[in-house]
Each structure stands twice: as C-alpha cells, then as structure tokens.
Regions:
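Conserved "landmark" site that anchors the functional core of diverse proteins
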Residues: 1-209
Length: 209
C-alpha cells in the first residue's frame, strides 16, 4: 500500500461520483476532471470508475510499501519518484520503498494518481468518493494527512504492453468556448435587445475584479 508522509494542500480519494442520493441532500462529489481521472485508470488497466487520488495545487508525499503500477495525469504538479521526474499520462512502476512526491504547481491545479487493481477503500452508497462536508466516503470522510495508510486491493508489478501504456499530453481545447445559457425566472425583466446582446457578446475571463 501507501503511507502518507505529507498530505499536501487537499488530497482526497475520489471516483466518478455518488449518484442517486441528491434528494436526501447527499451531493455527488467525485473527481473534478473526469477525463484525466478516466485516462489514468485506463493506463493501469482499471475500470474508469475506479477510485483515484485527486491532488489539488500542492501535492502530497507518499511512500510505497509494495511494488505497484501507477499513472499520473491531469495538471503538472511536479511529480517525482525518489527525486526523478515522472512522465505524466504513462503507466509507471513504483517499487517498494520508493517515495512519490509532488514538488509544485507548474501547469493546472489538479492531478490524479491511479493505482493498478485499485485502492482498498470501502464503498459507501455506491461510491468511494470523499464528501468532505458530510464526512462520508473516501478515507474516513476526510482529506489525506500525515500517517494515513491505504492498502492496494490487487497490486501489480507488471502489466502487458507496458511500453504502449502511454497517452500523449491532451489538449483541453481552444481558447474560445461557446457556453450554454439557461434563462432564469426573471428574464422578462430584460429587453429583447439586452438579452440578445448578452447572448451574442464575447467575454474575457481575467483575475481582475
């Protein structure tokens, strides 16, 4: 399994989410970047809904207690194994005793680690996702911290076609996006001209208020 040496800023166990309980007030939770998480699982031979570790901004440091094949996808948070850079979107063998760490935020804000065979995390209401607000799912319903240990369900030190288990760094599309807008209950407070201007204008996102 893995031993958490440092939990980082916000590191949780997530899968594709907990569906069917919204009417009781339980949110779906799940990974923020479904594409990156799915690709990580595919690279190590898992089902795409298998639980992964989701890392936000400043990543964790973890020690492996047994051999395991992993894949790191998503943003570039400076993943290293024993100080050597890890290629993202590739299946990689981590040996027992080695340490996986994340050294910074170089591109993107979230990264994902998939583990061949999955993590030994209990299923709660059909999902292994962590719901921090409700303290449900994942690892004791909370983010990972120093001293936490998670076992692997079916670790693998070898997978067929290892050299081919790689996916080129994906493009997340053009710089311009067309957004879908749903009109609200007060849309009749605006003129037709105003609504037309709103729907057909170009907007720029910035860090200015």
């Amino acid at each position: 399994g893995i031993q958490i040496i440092n939990g980082g800023f916000l590191t949780t166990v997530q899968d594709m989410g907990r569906y069917g309980y919204q009417e009781t007030g339980m949110s779906v939770s799940g990974v923020m970047d479904t594409r990156a998480a799915s690709l990580a699982n595919i690279l190590v031979g898992n089902d795409t809904n298998e639980a992964v570790i989701e890392i936000t901004m400043m990543g964790p440091t973890m020690k492996f207690t047994e051999d395991e094949i992993i894949a790191v996808t998503g943003g570039d948070l400076g993943a290293k194994i024993d100080g050597k850079p890890v290629e993202r979107y590739r299946a990689v063998l981590v040996k027992a005793g080695q340490t996986l760490s994340f050294m910074g935020m170089y591109g993107g804000s979230r990264a994902y680690i998939a583990f061949a065979g999955g993590l030994d995390i209990p299923v709660v209401m059909g999902s292994r996702s962590t719901n921090l607000k409700s303290k449900v799912g994942g690892y004791e319903g909370r983010k990972l911290g120093t001293g936490d240990e998670i076992a692997f369900r079916a670790p693998a030190s070898w997978l067929p076609h290892m050299a081919e288990r790689v996916y080129g760094l994906p493009s997340y599309g053009a710089k311009e996006w067309t957004l879908r807008v749903v009109m609200g209950p007060q849309d009749d407070c605006f003129t037709d001209k105003g609504i037309n201007t709103f729907l057909n204008s170009t907007y720029t996102i910035s860090n200015e208020y």
